[in-house]
Regions:
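Glycine-rich ThDP/TPP pyrophosphate-binding loop and its adjacent helix/strand module
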Residues: 1, 197-400, 405-406, 595-625
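Conserved acidic/glycine
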Residues: 1-126, 130, 141, 333-507
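A glycine-rich helix N-cap at a beta->alpha junction
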Residues: 168-182, 253-263, 511-514, 557-576, ...
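Short acidic, glycine/serine/threonine-rich loops at helix termini
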Residues: 127-129, 159-164, 243-247, 271-276, ...
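Cofactor-binding active-site loop characterized by glycine-rich and histidine/acidic residues
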Residues: 106-255, 273-280, 284, 289-291, ...
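Active-site nucleophile and cofactor-binding loops and adjacent substrate-binding regions
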Residues: 109-121, 151-153, 185, 193-212, ...
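Short hydrophobic alpha-helices that are characteristic scaffold elements of the AMP-binding
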Residues: 530-531
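Glycine/charged-rich beta-loop-alpha catalytic/anionic-binding loops adjacent to active sites
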Residues: 105-111, 189-205, 229-232, 290-294, ...
Length: 625
């Protein structure tokens, strides 16, 4: 039997002895024949084995820390998990009922909401007791709170870190008072997902990897700003097939960011079985390719969620970097409410459901609510205590549903409010009125084709585009100090076209950040860094490469203010056009791709003075430009 102190001493001694034993094995006579041999270029036997040993010992230490955290949990913590899981299951039952029966709308119809449930996956609430929750901190310190980026099914985790049942109901039913109001009173219902940024819950998105990629950027901001903050990014196994998720893990591994990724293997992603998603033995194996320690846990046990999150948090905040937690689980319902009949089978037997009964039976027996309830009883809880808690939670959720139903529906004309900090979007009516006023003709510019309003100089000391942009970037670096970062490909040596030489000459090398060659993670992580307290300047090296960041630009950065009123102070520089002399894929004229997106501000300078002014002014906006 160990206590905390004796277990710590045992763990320390165990690791020392194991490390010593591994060192001794390297020099056994049977290995002497490969001593000094080059295993791979520039890596001999000794160096190769030392690195392998270092990673192995890291995994052993993390395993011992998980055991330590699991062993330190008391009855009160188990009862808290049971309460949160009970609340989640009660929410699930209401959400299914709402979807099936709907509630009345002003036009005389019915609406049933979005509908994602957590059945059999409520154990994820265990993560919350390992986190520094925003709701437990004074308002002035909430920027230091840990951040979660839940998947759509993690209702229990959102509730456990502080979202209320009313928030979840209002979001999934699209009521005017929901959090998804673009920061405008009574303008909710724009997005039917969970989330509350002020409580440390990054709202998920339908393009699944956006949330984890954005959370990676928030983690990047924490590291650059030296904020002691941890980040947790759960996804499903289907999302783990997406390139943007891999790019997020790759950046986190390369930069040692304080984040834990969590792949929840639901067994079936919508209707695609795991054999169609990955050839790896486990989804945890995906971490090793990124240099990230990973392990597998049972998703029906909140204790394993708690211990794994606690160990990951400790490792990350001690400077170890990211981890990957693989969760074996199964959802006891369809992908969404509408999917239940196809997935499980209709009550009428038609359709019969395609999921094997044996698979369903196995996971039904692992249902965390009754199993963990029995465990609570076995360690000292009493039946009356649990019944009282269950009645309380049911009453809380019932009351929240009633209050949600009393909330007004949003007015349709509120949907145009706040697409950027500067303006609202036009309605179709307003667009048609403008077309009629303009007579349907293309407006003429102030100059005829080929005319110039500015006389360009050939003098050796005249300003150029490049010089103007360099001067503007130096001015921004000096104005914003530690809050600014210039991020993109090949930034730290000189940057494309040597544009970063002035920043380096002025002593701002520390503000330059080389990114992996992935336009998507450049923009997604820059968006996250903007949410995390920075004012990034992101660079896409050539115009055509912006296509690789389309999802990040239009489905992420452009929509955050409109969805929930977020400030996203992000400036993106993209050189394009014939002057780059770079041909196809590089010089593409891309303005038409983005100018019709209401959440993006597009500026296109035509001379050096405008290049300077627009870069300075753009960066003062709290919007993506």
């Amino acid at each position: 039997q160990f206590n905390g102190e004796t277990y710590h001493l045992f763990s320390k001694q165990f690791c020392q002895e194991m490390s010593k034993s591994l060192d001794e094995r390297i020099w056994k006579p049977e290995l002497s024949i490969i001593e000094g041999e080059e295993v791979i270029p520039m890596r001999d036997t000794e160096l190769y084995l030392k690195r392998r040993k270092k990673r192995f010992m890291r995994d052993i230490r993390l395993c011992l820390r998980r055991i330590a955290y699991a062993s330190s949990v008391d009855l009160d913590t188990h009862l808290q998990w049971q309460r949160w899981m009970t609340r989640t299951r009660a929410m699930d039952e209401h959400l299914k009922d709402l979807f099936s029966n709907g509630i009345s709308t002003p036009d005389g119809g019915k609406f049933g909401g979005k509908g994602f449930r957590s059945t059999w996956q409520e154990g994820v609430v265990g993560c919350a007791t390992s986190l520094n929750r925003a709701i437990d901190l004074p308002p002035e310190n909430r920027h230091q709170a840990d951040i979660i980026a839940p998947m759509i099914r993690d209702v229990g985790l959102a509730l456990a870190v502080g979202q209320t049942p009313l928030e979840i109901f209002a979001a999934q039913m699209g009521k005017s008072g929901s959090y998804m109001d673009g920061g405008n009173l009574d303008s909710g219902g724009r997005d039917l997902h969970i989330g509350n940024w002020e409580k440390g819950v990054l709202p998920p998105t339908a393009p699944l990897p956006i949330a984890s990629a954005t959370a990676t950027g928030v983690a990047l901001a924490a590291k650059l700003l030296r904020i002691n903050r941890f980040h947790l990014a759960p996804v499903g196994e289907g999302c783990s097939s997406n390139g943007e998720f891999w790019e997020a893990m790759n950046l986190a591994g390369a930069r040692g960011l304080p984040i834990a990724f969590m792949i929840q293997n639901n067994q079936i992603a919508l209707d695609t079985f795991t054999v169609g998603q990955s050839g790896a033995e486990t989804f945890g194996d995906k971490g090793h390719a990124m240099g990230i320690p990973s392990w597998t846990i049972d998703g029906s046990d909140p204790l394993q969620f708690h211990a794994s999150t606690a160990a990951s948090r400790e490792y990350a905040l001690d400077g170890g970097g990211p981890t990957l937690i693989h969760v074996e689980t199964m959802r006891g319902c369809g992908h969404a409410h509408h999917h239940d009949d196809l997935y499980l089978g209709s009550v009428t037997g038609n359709p019969p459901g395609y999921v094997g009964r044996e698979l369903l039976s196995y996971w039904a027996e692992k249902d965390p609510l009754p199993n963990h309830r029995d465990y609570c009883l076995s360690i000292g809880a009493n039946e009356k205590q649990l019944i009282s808690m269950e009645e309380e939670e049911q009453a809380i959720v019932d009351a929240a549903r009633k209050k949600m139903e009393e909330m007004p529906w949003p007015e349709g004309n509120t949907v145009t409010k706040g697409v950027t900090s500067r303006h609202d979007a036009e309605t179709h009516t307003e667009q048609f009125e403008r077309f009629e006023k303009e007579g349907g003709e293309i407006l003429s510019g102030p100059l005829k084709d080929g005319d110039l309003a500015i006389e360009f100089s050939n003098a050796s000391n005249s300003s150029t585009y490049g010089r103007a942009i360099q001067n503007a970037m130096v001015a921004l670096a000096e104005r914003h100090g530690d809050d600014i970062v210039f991020m993109g490909e090949d930034m730290e040596v000189a940057g494309a076209f040597g544009m970063n030489s002035s920043l380096k000459a002025k002593g701002h090398s520390g503000k330059l950040l080389d990114m992996p060659l992935s336009e998507s993670i450049i923009i997604n992580s820059a968006t996250g860094a903007a949410l995390g307290g920075m004012r990034p300047v992101a660079e896409i090296q050539f115009g055509g490469f912006a296509a690789l960041a389309m999802n990040a630009l239009v489905n992420n950065a452009a929509q955050l203010r409109w969805r929930w009123g977020a400030d996203v102070p992000l400036t993106i520089r993209i050189p394009l056009g014939a002057k780059t002399r770079s041909g196809p894929f590089h010089a593409n004229m891309i303005e038409s791709w983005f100018v019709n997106d209401p959440g993006l501000t597009i500026v296109f300078p035509s001379n050096p003075q405008d290049a300077y002014d627009l870069l300075i002014e753009s960066h003062e906006l709290n919007d993506p430009v």
